[in-house]
Regions:
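Extended, charged coiled-coil "arm/hinge" scaffolds of SMC/Rad50-like chromosome-maintenance ATPases
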Residues: 528, 532-566
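Cytosolic, long alpha-helical scaffolding segments
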Residues: 434-444, 506-522
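ATPase nucleotide-binding head domains, primarily ABC-like/P-loop NTPase cores
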Residues: 29-32, 241, 310, 321, ...
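C-terminal tails and terminal domains of large nucleic-acid-associated
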Residues: 864-900
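Active-site phosphate-binding and catalytic loops of NTP-dependent enzymes
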Residues: 81, 104-113, 262, 481-493, ...
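Charged catalytic and DNA/RNA-contacting regions of genome-maintenance
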Residues: 1-343, 347-351, 356-361, 375-388, ...
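Charged, surface-exposed helical/loop "interaction arms" that form contiguous linear patches used
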Residues: 389, 393, 403-406, 460-461, ...
Length: 900
């Protein structure tokens, strides 16, 4: 047996192996020690192998999912080896085989998965971009290939990007597990990835290294074509994504290995381009608290506020819409249209009518009826996957049957509103139950057992042989009562009993007082202290028949259930289309409910550059104020267009500058994803990215101070923001001297205004920056209001024109509970500093043009040009130490006038 275990373990050296032995899964040697540490289970030794004690630990079969869930949460992978041989016919150890490998990115079991989020598996690989390609910003630029798979949903995707965009992809995909080539074989890619990964802040994902040969582009293209049953990937827009094909090769190999079978539920491919999506860098996802708070919690976030979906698949789709907003506004317009129709259309109003047609005055909006109907639907998406993988449970199929039976009523609810909304009309077509699927599921018992091994899964009347075997088992009690009565009469033993237990089977029990009357045909089976147990030829014959019938009944039922699943697997495409329609309807109904409950309005898209928000609100802050019965939220306007590209925002801490900036970004994001928005009105022009530099945080793990993190993020924004980007800059320049910070803040504001020409909200405590608007016509000063009352301060949280008169830092310190002596000294010192500032010379003009040295006007000579060309071709973020040294030598040669 240990030889068999060691053979299996050799195939999975870095994975915990759960080795099935009867009613337990056993772990041996180092696996047992590790499981003991992680799960706090008992460790023991038994016998010897190769002269060493066999260290072992085990978990019960009936509770294995609980232990698997704990291990997955800790980032472990587990290979489950089941007994596949027949115990009764095996000579020697029963044959065992690994039937699945459970890893964080390949989960399919409902007990291991979170209902409302997806566990994505992502493969990454890089290569040097070809010279002259659009992706190569230098001769040594890296091009990244991505391939991802949602094992539980069948969602498969590929993409390519430059290193600067990789962080955004990691933030939007949020993988649970990452597949990478060995770092020692891809040094440059590994170095670049480590930097990007640290900045993305996604250290919770498990990193799994796969052999370098698995990242092969030709192999990946062939695997993708085989998986999708096509000759070319042209129809998916993925034919020319060679680096992504290499990632897909490793992804599909790993996925098929973990499932020990083909992935028949993976039937489509998405190949989004970074140019199709609004860019949301990791800092934006983090600072806007889209899916997690800054503390890493799931609530309160924008997603937690918005997610009132009735199904898990709806919640997962909502998360995807939120993190994948599209630049093309057509899809968002269709979603707005559907939400408006669900809000306006009364439930029960027939198609071809108008919303103003007479209806039941008590009728609720269509979205409420739709949400009520969705309560009776199950997670069709994940159930269809488990059907494809032959892992589905009886009660999941019962839920699928209930969903199909609810479709006619659900479709009738949608049809009326669908007349005026294209998305609703498309989904209504998918809400027609397939008669063959319903017929197949009709063989299922009305309330099947939770597990197939318990029996009672197939309905009576479906199979004559099964009914006959069940009848034998069901008539068992009647037979035993009849036999007991006959034997009492025949023997005259009044307390004789006929019983059954799992150890000894059927038996006749006679107490000591009646043993002298036991007939000769009674055969002794067991002796007890005060009784004897016997069996007769008649009882033995019945036992053989009954026990055989029970085993044969379970075997027959298992076979019938497997046939049912095989039949359902032929309708996988229809089930997946149904799942997509139900998920989309759930999200649209959720967004309609949120729009009505939170009093959100439909945004309007325009073609010219514009962010025009009337009475905008921060949705999460407003909701928290209402929950805590705090002060009413103060709405604020924001108007940015071709004439006003930048708002310079000043005012006190706690005044609401950051809240105002974040609410503008959230409103832009919500409108772009297809939701209504928390504002009285909203007009929005084209947007290609939302960049943020908000808050302060050290990155100790990567030896970066708060100021370094701030400058790194600001530099990325200056390099990437376009005239269609929205940029939030909050108090840039902190963490260094006032002079340095002020100079940097002024230079950054100038670059954003003159070079990037993006929409910018620039919050600052440097009062000197309020002069920026005097020198730059597209900049405007605004401030958050505050009123002093004696030594107290009242924050108005209102954005008003013009600069703030002061920052009120001392008053805020007093509100924070600072000792009175400290506040008093600070106030006196502040007065002295202000008087001294008034007596000094006028401050240097921060925004005057930089005077160029006289020599700079001259045309650079050939040596200077050679050095400049070499510098322009370098990519410092991707250079290895060796390559950096070689580049330095080339620069020195060029500076000395020799050939580079």
């Amino acid at each position: 047996m240990m030889a068999q275990y060691l053979r299996i373990k050799a195939e999975f050296p870095d994975t915990l192996v759960f080795y099935r032995m009867g009613d337990f899964y056993e772990l041996f040697y180092e696996d047992a020690r590790k499981a003991h540490r992680l799960l706090d289970i008992t460790i023991t030794t038994r016998g010897q192998s190769a002269g060493e004690p066999v260290v072992m630990a085990g978990v019960p079969v009936h509770s294995v999912e609980t232990y698997l869930a704990r291990l997955i949460k800790l980032g472990e992978a587990v290979a489950v080896a089941e007994q596949v041989g027949d115990v009764t016919t095996s000579k020697g150890p029963v044959e065992r085989k690994v039937v699945r490998v459970v890893t964080p990115g390949t989960l399919t079991d409902s007990e291991l998965l979170a209902d409302r989020s997806e566990s994505l598996l992502l493969a990454l690989v890089s290569q040097i971009a070809p010279t002259g390609s659009r992706s190569a910003s230098g001769p040594q630029a890296l091009r990244w290939g991505l391939a991802w798979l949602g094992m539980a949903s069948g969602r498969l995707g590929v993409a390519e990007c430059e290193g600067a965009d990789l962080g955004s992809w990691l933030a939007r995909l949020e993988p649970a597990e990452l597949l990478l080539p060995p770092p020692d074989e891809h040094t440059r890619g590994a170095t670049a990835f480590n930097t990007i990964w640290a900045n993305a802040g996604r250290a919770t994902a498990v990193l799994t290294h796969r052999p370098a040969w698995q990242f092969d582009a030709a192999l990946g293209r062939r695997k993708l074509c085989e998986q999708l049953k096509v000759q070319s990937l042209q129809a998916f827009g993925a034919e020319d994504l060679g680096v992504a094909h290499a990632a897909a090769a490793a992804l599909l190999s790993y996925a098929q290995q973990t499932q020990s079978q083909a992935l028949s539920h993976v039937q489509s491919l998405e190949a989004p381009s970074g140019q199709d999506l609004i860019d949301l860098p990791p800092s934006t996802v983090r600072n806007l608290e889209l899916t997690r708070t800054l503390r890493g919690e799931d609530s309160p976030t924008l997603l937690s506020l918005m997610d009132s979906c009735r199904t898990g698949m709806g919640s997962r789709l909502l998360r995807q819409w939120l993190t994948h907003p599209l630049r093309d506004r057509h899809q968002a317009r269709l979603r707005h249209q559907a939400i408006g129709s669900l809000l306006a259309w009364p439930a029960g109003l027939p198609p071809k009518a108008t919303p103003e047609s007479p209806a039941n005055p008590a009728a609720s909006p269509a979205f409420e009826a739709l949400r009520q109907a969705l309560r009776h639907t199950c997670d069709v998406e994940r159930i269809s996957t488990r059907v494809a993988l032959r892992q589905v449970r009886p009660r999941e199929l019962a839920g699928l049957r209930e969903t199909l039976q609810a479709l006619p009523a659900l479709r009738a609810t949608v049809l009326g509103a669908a007349e005026h909304a294209q998305l609703l009309a498309q989904d209504a077509q998918a809400l027609q139950p397939d008669a063959q699927i319903l017929e197949t599921l009709g063989a299922l018992a009305h309330e099947p057992a939770a597990l197939l091994r318990d029996g009672g899964v197939v309905a009576p009347g479906v199979d004559a042989e099964l009914d006959e075997l069940r009848a034998i088992a069901q008539n068992c009690d009647a037979f035993l009562l009849d036999l007991e009565a006959r034997e009492r009469e025949r023997t005259g033993i009044g307390n004789l009993r006929v019983q059954f237990n799992k150890v000894h089977g059927f038996y006749i029990e006679v107490t000591s007082s009646g043993l002298d009357r036991v007939p000769a045909d009674y055969q002794r089976r067991q002796t007890l202290k005060n009784a004897e147990r016997f069996i007769t030829p008649e009882l033995k014959a019945f036992e053989d028949k009954a026990l055989s019938a029970q085993d044969r009944s379970l075997a027959r039922e298992k076979w019938l259930f497997e046939q049912m699943v095989e039949a359902l697997a032929t309708h996988l495409s229809a089930l997946q289309r149904l799942a997509q329609a139900l998920a989309r309807l759930d999200v649209l109904a959720c967004l309609a409910e949120r729009a009505q409950t939170l009093q959100w309005t439909e945004p309007q898209f325009v073609n010219h550059p514009c962010i025009d928000i009337e009475a905008g609100r921060h949705p999460v802050v407003q909701a928290r104020l209402q929950e805590t019965r705090g002060a009413a939220f103060m709405p604020n306007h924001c108007r940015l267009d071709a004439r006003t590209k930048m708002l310079v925002i000043t005012g006190p801490n706690m005044g609401g500058k950051s809240t105002f900036m974040r609410q503008v970004a959230l409103i832009v994001l919500l409108a772009s994803m297809g939701s209504y928005v928390p504002a009285q009105s909203c007009r929005l022009g084209p947007i290609d990215a939302i960049h943020t530099r908000i808050g302060a945080a050290d990155d100790l793990a990567n030896a970066q101070s708060t100021f370094m993190v701030e400058m790194t993020e600001a530099a990325a924004i200056l390099h990437r923001a376009s005239e269609h980007s929205l940029v939030l800059m909050d108090e840039i320049g902190r963490g260094t001297s006032t002079e340095d910070g002020l100079a940097l803040a002024g230079a950054i504001a100038t670059h954003l205004h003159e070079r990037n020409r993006c929409f910018t909200l620039f919050a600052t405590h440097y009062f000197e920056l309020t002069a920026f608007a005097q020198h730059h016509p597209q900049a405007l000063n605004v401030h958050v209001g505050a009123v002093e009352s004696g030594q107290d301060i009242v924050f108005l949280h209102e954005i008003a024109p013009g600069p703030a008169s002061r920052s009120y830092g001392v008053q805020v310190a007093r509100l924070a509970g600072m000792p009175a002596a400290v506040v008093r000294q600070a106030r006196n010192t502040l007065g002295s500093l202000e008087r001294r500032a008034l007596a000094q010379q006028p401050q240097v003009d921060l925004f005057a043009g930089v005077a160029a040295p006289a020599a700079a006007a001259a045309e650079p000579n050939s040596t200077a040009r050679a050095v400049i060309e070499l510098l322009e071709g370098l990519q410092p973020d991707t250079l290895s130490p060796r390559e950096a040294l070689e580049a330095l030598y080339r620069l020195k040669d060029a500076a000395n006038g020799s050939s580079a």
